Amino acid sequence: MSGTKLENLNVASQEPLITPEALKQELPLSGKAAETVENGRQAIYDIMDGKDHRLFVVVGPCSIHDVEAARDYAVKLKKLADEVSDTLLVVMRVYFEKPRTTVGWKGLINDPHLNDTFDIEQGLHIGRRLLLDISELGLPTATEALDPISPQYLQDTISWSAIGARTTESQTHREMSSGLSMAIGFKNGTDGSLDVAVNAMKSVSHPHSFLGIDQQGKVAIIRTRGNNYGHVVLRGGGGKPNYDSVSVALCEQALEKAKLRQSIMVDCSHANSSKDPAIQPLVLQDITHQILEGNQSIQGLMVESNLNWGNQSIPENLADLKYGVSVTDACIDWETTEKALRDMRDKLKDVLPKRRG
């Protein structure tokens, strides 16, 4: 019996991956891109600290599957971001990893060719190159930190990160978040509960030690200082929205009870829109109204937006993909995005400077 194999019984294969250090040497961060990342992070810190009166708005596709469409979108968004910059800090949503309740396409890093070949190394190259290109435009980026290893490859290009509703309760993701170099938004649970996000904020503010990889790709003990810029993202749940003024007030109370900063972001999509993109602009209007009525705690917004409306399934023949249309959640189109953000800017431009920090 001594020759019996006892490990890797269900592992089909293993292959080495490029190290974070090597990827960064191949695709280095330029001075302009680094400035964009740093300025974006600091602006979000200042908004959360009450030093900057603006709202920060994370807007972009539900997920990235076509880098050319993403670049086209980024050029348009940069122009709009400059136009509304006195009132809104616009950050582009650049999501490469998609959590799955069961199975499905897991995102550009995991399967960049959309054909179940899982060319992860190519996915990391494609993803980092896109993030660098967007940063070169002067547009900060945001992503979801889903895989605890990929931040070592990409986090130097990111100004804001999210932890999703399915992973906010995960100890692994809380530990990772305590060491990330930017503000982190924790979504409430898929059932709508706030406790998981509030507890996550408490956890990540403290130092942690855990297993990870270093820049040379070696397994390492990671020791963190803690991250004091965690905040709640209200995304609805349990079949109900939670962006209304009563839900926001309940969130404020929960944060106050936990002695945490009252810094709230509202996700206009997911359960807050019943996954109907047409509802997202209505959520933006409601948040605008709450701020006009005196709300002080809402500091950020998230909008799922693409070049074109709706979504599509990934076809067997990838040539049949519609350009600029999401392959995951349905998004609002560019024209709707422009109108919604311009309307918000016009209504809040004279109000936000008078808002208390």
Residue ranges of each PLM-predicted region?
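Active-site-facing alpha/beta catalytic cores
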Residues: S2-N8, A74, T87-Y243, S247-V248, ...
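N- or domain-start disorder-to-order transition segments that initiate the globular core
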Residues: L9-D49
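Domain-level signal for soluble alpha/beta catalytic cores
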Residues: V11-A22, L29, F96-T102, G107-E121, ...
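Conserved phosphate/anionic-ligand binding catalytic regions in large, soluble enzymes, centered on
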Residues: F56-A69, D329
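Conserved, mostly hydrophobic/aromatic
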Residues: G60, V266, D333
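Histidine-anchored nucleotide/phosphate-binding helix
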Residues: A70-E83
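Active-site or pore-adjacent capping/gating segments
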Residues: L292-G357
